[in-house]
């Protein structure tokens, strides 16, 4: 689902605020970088710059004394200073590079940790590909700014100021002429810098949107191919590719104009200053050595100005990244450990007049009330889209009811810590999620502690999954592929059931899967589910007649409302729609 207008407006409205120094500093603090590396890098850069500033000053007397012969010692000293400056600058670059990598490492860790702790409703509004862009691209932009552009701009400004000071000492008239020319150059560059800032925001947004579309299509590549939807998928991405192209053209214009315009302005300034310097020599006000020394300082400035220009370019590009990362880190996340620790065993689970809507649009659930006694089986039945899965989402606390409450043993489930609550709940869905990795990793996913091979084989036995795992080449260490594509649907279901056995939940939630399985797989999965349900409070979205008949209580849900409840025989006799649903929709098991 794409971001809604409200989120887009919120981003746009905060644009100016997020690019402020306050938000940038906040973001860097969140990364908890190695400040010592930054200090060492800056100090080394300052030392290298100070050495570089001494060279033109030493050239002045060296040139003026050429009439009396070449001073080999002074020439060697000038060369040594150049080499020393380059070596110290290299050290500064290496240290700052390490600092930058520590920033991006810590920032990515912080952003990733934030992402996985965000509530499910956040992921309903933002594409996963867009979030991947935040994690990869935006953090890299911030790293480039803080590790490269800012230190280089700092040392460049120091070189600029130092050069001006030494030039004032050598010849104030020529320096004054340059000081007058610099604001004119900056005035020329200001519109281009503003243009670059706008491009930075737009490019990052479009790139994130394109990555979202690409991630969505690639994650469902089997659906794309089986539906002959390659052309449709290509067309869907075409608009974003074209948008990125247009932004790229603007960025190319920006990058292309920035340095040449700056360089042209600088060269015109230098040419004018050189002409003025020759005039001063002709009038006896200045020596040739002084002019050459000042020209060397000006050559420093020629290198400085593009660096400063690059800083503004990177600042413009990073401004959007900084804003989006700051917004992400400011999002309210789930608090896993806040609340009571409660043993759910032997307690009654109840819903009291629960209403729910995903947003301000149509209400999904209306006045839902039910009760699940300890170790009982509660079945939810009814037409598709009635709200059965939404009830499960509320029980897993992915969302909060808009009215009413859900209790366990008379205590609101909101008062129980999320970690404690979810650790005692098991969920087996129609299409159980399997992560890329080994069978062992999938069985123990999210569980703390060490599990022996014997523990894993035991739960595989209970889930009727041992035989197919034993026949695999690496058994427990077999890779199942992304989303478990290397194993069948029935095998994925049985692994999910084995995982639920290993969790040993007090409350079990099942969304029966039968329609997509062959008869043999269905039989094995159902036997595993029957075994898993024993001795547990079980809530099941029923698709099989046998489950309905065996349930202690059935709640019939249509259009978000419970229109009937009771045992199977009672509902068949008193609820015509239920009787029709049972005869037409439910699977008759063996």
From Swiss-Prot:
Assembly and binders: Homodimer.
UniProt keyword Disulfide bond present: no
CDD domains membership: ABC_6TM_LmrA_like (cd18551)
SUPFAM superfamilies: ABC transporter transmembrane region, P-loop containing nucleoside triphosphate hydrolases
Protein name: Multidrug resistance ABC transporter ATP-binding and permease protein
Any one Gene Ontology BP term: response to antibiotic
PANTHER family: ATP-BINDING CASSETTE SUB-FAMILY B MEMBER 10, MITOCHONDRIAL, ATP-DEPENDENT PERMEASE MDL1, MITOCHONDRIAL
Limits of the ABC transporter domain: 349-584
Superkingdom of this protein's organism: Bacteria
Major subcellular location class: membrane
Compartments, record wording: Cell membrane
Record keywords, A-Z: Antibiotic resistance, ATP-binding, Cell membrane, Membrane, Nucleotide-binding, Translocase, Transmembrane, Transmembrane helix, Transport
Function comment: Efflux transporter for a variety of amphiphilic cationic compounds, including antibiotics.
Known EC number: 7.6.2.2
Family: Belongs to the ABC transporter superfamily. Multidrug exporter LmrA (TC 3.A.1.117.1) family.
Residues reported in the UniProt entry to bind ATP: 382-389
Domain ABC transmembrane type-1, residue spans: 38-317
């Amino acid at each position: 689902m794409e971001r809604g207008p409200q989120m887009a407006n919120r981003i746009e409205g905060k644009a100016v605020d997020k690019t402020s120094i306050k938000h940038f500093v906040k973001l860097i603090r969140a990364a908890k970088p190695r400040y010592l590396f930054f200090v060492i890098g800056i100090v080394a850069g300052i030392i290298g710059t100070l050495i570089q500033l001494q060279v033109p000053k030493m050239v002045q007397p060296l040139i003026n004394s050429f009439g009396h012969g070449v001073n080999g010692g002074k020439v060697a000293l000038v060369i040594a200073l150049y080499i020393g400056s380059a070596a110290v600058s290299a050290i500064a670059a290496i240290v700052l590079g390490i600092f930058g990598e520590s920033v991006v490492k810590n920032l990515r860790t912080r952003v990733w940790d934030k992402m996985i702790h965000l509530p499910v409703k956040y992921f309903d509004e933002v594409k996963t590909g867009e979030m991947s862009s935040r994690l990869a691209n935006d953090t890299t932009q911030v790293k480039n700014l803080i590790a490269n552009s800012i230190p280089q701009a700092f040392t460049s400004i120091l070189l600029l100021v130092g050069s001006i000071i030494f030039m004032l000492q050598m010849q104030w008239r020529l320096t004054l002429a340059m000081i007058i020319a610099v604001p004119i150059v900056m005035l020329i560059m200001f519109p281009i810098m503003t243009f670059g800032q706008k491009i930075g925001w737009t490019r990052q947004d479009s790139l994130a949107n394109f990555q979202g579309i690409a991630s969505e299509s690639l994650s469902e590549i089997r659906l794309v191919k089986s539906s002959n939807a390659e052309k449709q998928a290509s067309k869907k991405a075409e608009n974003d590719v074209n948008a990125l192209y247009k932004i790229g053209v603007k960025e190319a214009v920006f990058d292309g104009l920035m340095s040449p315009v700056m360089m042209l302005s600088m060269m015109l300034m230098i040419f004018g200053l050189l002409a003025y310097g020759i005039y001063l020599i002709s009038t006896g006000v200045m020596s040739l050595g002084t002019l050459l020394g000042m020209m060397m300082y000006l050559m420093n400035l020629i290198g400085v100005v593009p660096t400063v220009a690059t800083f503004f370019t990177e600042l413009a590009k990073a401004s959007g990244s900084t804003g989006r990362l700051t917004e992400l880190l400011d999002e309210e996340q789930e608090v896993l450990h806040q609340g009571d620790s409660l043993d759910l065993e032997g307690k009654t689970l109840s819903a009291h007049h629960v209403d729910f809507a995903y947003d301000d649009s149509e209400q999904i659930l209306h006045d839902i009330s039910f009760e699940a006694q300890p170790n009982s089986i509660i079945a939810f039945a009814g037409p598709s889209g009635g709200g059965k899965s939404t009830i499960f989402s509320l029980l897993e606390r992915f969302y909060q009811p808009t009215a009413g409450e859900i209790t366990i043993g008379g205590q609101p489930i909101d008062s129980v810590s999320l970690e404690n609550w979810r650790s005692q709940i098991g969920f087996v869905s129609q299409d159980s999620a399997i992560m890329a990795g080994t069978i062992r990793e999938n069985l123990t996913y999210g569980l703390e502690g060490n599990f022996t091979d014997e523990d894993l084989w035991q739960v595989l036995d209970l889930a009727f999954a041992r035989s197919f795992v034993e026949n695999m080449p690496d058994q427990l260490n077999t890779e199942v592929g992304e989303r478990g594509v290397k194993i069948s649907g029935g095998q994925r279901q049985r692994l999910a059931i084995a995982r639920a056995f290993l969790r040993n939940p007090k409350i079990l939630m099942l969304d029966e899967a039968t329609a997509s399985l062959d008869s043999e797989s269905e039989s094995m999965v159902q036997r595993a589910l029957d075994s898993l349900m024993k001795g547990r409070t079980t809530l099941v979205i029923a698709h099989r007649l046998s489950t309905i008949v065996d349930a202690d209580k059935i709640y019939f849900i249509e259009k978000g409302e419970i229109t009937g409840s009771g045992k199977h025989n009672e509902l068949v006799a008193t609820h015509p729609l239920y009787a029709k649903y049972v005869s037409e929709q439910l699977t008759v098991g063996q």
